[in-house]
Amino acid sequence: DNADLFPDPASRFQPKGPHGPSQIINPQVFRWTDHDWRGVTIPGQIIYELHIGTFTAEGTYESAISKLPHLKRTGITVVELMPLAEFSGCFGWGYDGVDLFAPSHLYGTPDDLRAFVDAAHKTGLGVILDVVYNHLGPDGNYLKQYSADYFTEKATEWGEAINFDGPNSLPVREFFLSNVEYWIREFHMDGLRLDATQSIFDSSDEHILAAIARTAHNAADGRATIVTAENEPQHARLARPVDQGGYGLDALWNDDFHHSALVALTGHKEAYYQDHSGAPQEFISAAKYGFLFQGQRYDWQKKPRGTPTRGVTPSAFVNFVENHDQVANGGRGARLHQRTSSGRYRAMTALLLLAPGTPLLFQGQEFQSSAPFLYFAEHKAELARAVAKGRREFLAQFPSLATPEMVACFPDPASEETFMRCKLDWSELDKNQQALQMIKDLLSLRREDPAFAAQASGKIDGAVLGPNAFLLRYFLEDEQDRLLIVNLGTDLELARAPEPLLAPPENKTWRLLWSTENPVYGGCGTPNPDTDNGWRFPGESALVLAPGDLQPQAPNPQGTAS
């Protein structure tokens, strides 16, 4: 009955939501079995982003455990959980969390989450958690009731920014850094993904991002941990070692790869896609250098974007063609395979999974799920109307989505139906075995073939072969090079090939090693592209070529002149 009662700001559990009482949790009760788990480092990882509430029909930590063996068999190595901090309403993406230490009660208890992580480690999978340290949600945020010092007058597009460098900011920094330690120590997380770091403001001698990375790396008592981040301005400094003037994060999301891929596959160049053409050179440059914009003018923002990436390891760029934001930003939540041809989608998937960066798949992508991923967030009526209005205004940057006809089709974010539509239909796993088999084979090739496993940008080069076709050559010291040919256009014939990257190693010829046109994947078959009359690359396909021995020439039946 006392209106001045508030939840504990460091509550470990809110069983009745962010407005209810805080439950005392003993973190020592759970019996871990992952004592031999040594953690993860970024090289060699395959990340899988999932939302607990829509990953299974039940939408719980416990039910998600049953899918871990499938992820392992597919070739996934790290599960990335969308934010779990307690938020208001019965469903939401999680980016409006308010109780940073309390895993959402909607998905189970804190020990249920521990059981999920423990099971993942037993299966051979790492787990990292998406955390939001740039703002807190609009409903259920009681931190100001304890101190106004948590926030600053600086604004983000989602609300007040966190005070990491202003008056009385030291306890604020300690609060958030203790949250970093909490997830890694008490839940055995293998690292964190930091949301929208461009909206984390700090002028301290040690930037809070560097402090977060340092804390995360030191918190695991000998286990290896990783810290990845979203950084829209593409500041490569975040992923440089501290002794080189960087912040010491392990990897950054690479929006450039996604934007070029979407333009190439759909032809749409609206809003923040307008600076990308989807041309072959963009993919060659992405494979060699990571970010495409490294200080050039970015017309969409009317200013330079990005910083040079020289010296940043290739595994520090997280590449994707789908994630939660980009699928939802299509307006109707359609998956990318639904917006292009099957051949082109297979070819782009091959590039994603064989390029030197760290690939990320979004839930259901491995079996071409038909479930959309829409923006959903349940709030009280007035706030729900404001959220829906804000979503419409955000999508209005895309002219095709700003028409009255399209606006009328937008799902209501606060509707339970919108949320339920996003749940994966796991019966599609059996129906779409061709798509799944291709992902499995690609990840096996990436893992077992030395050329792809190396993730070495210094040992890769590329060439444009046509308006929609290009090659990447992966160099190995023993001349066991690999050629990845990607053709997003029609059949391409090259009678002459004055391109040295097409030349096989000495005394070798090229043999077809792998193709997206394998009938096992739904393709139409692939003749050897290197013919007596030149090269012939099938349209809408990707091929991997490996050196093979030359066939001995048949003896000349006419003999030789004496």
Regions found by a protein language model. Name each.
Residues H51, V98-D99, L192-Q198, G330-R335, ...:
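Glycine- and acidic
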Residues P9, P15, F30-I47, H51-I226, ...:
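Substrate-binding/active-site clefts of carbohydrate-active enzymes
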Residues H51-T56, A85, S104, Y133, ...:
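Short, flexible loop/turn elements at secondary-structure junctions
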Residues D1-Y48, A57, I65-T74, A334, ...:
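Carbohydrate-interacting/catalytic domains
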Residues P83, S104, D130-V131, G166, ...:
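Active-site proximal loops enriched in glycine and acidic residues that flank catalytic Cys/His/Asp
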Residues L209, A213-E405, R447, Q480, ...:
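Conserved alpha/beta catalytic core and glycan-binding cleft of carbohydrate-active enzymes
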Residues H121, N163, F176, E181, ...:
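Hydrophobic alpha-helix feature that most strongly marks membrane-spanning transmembrane helices
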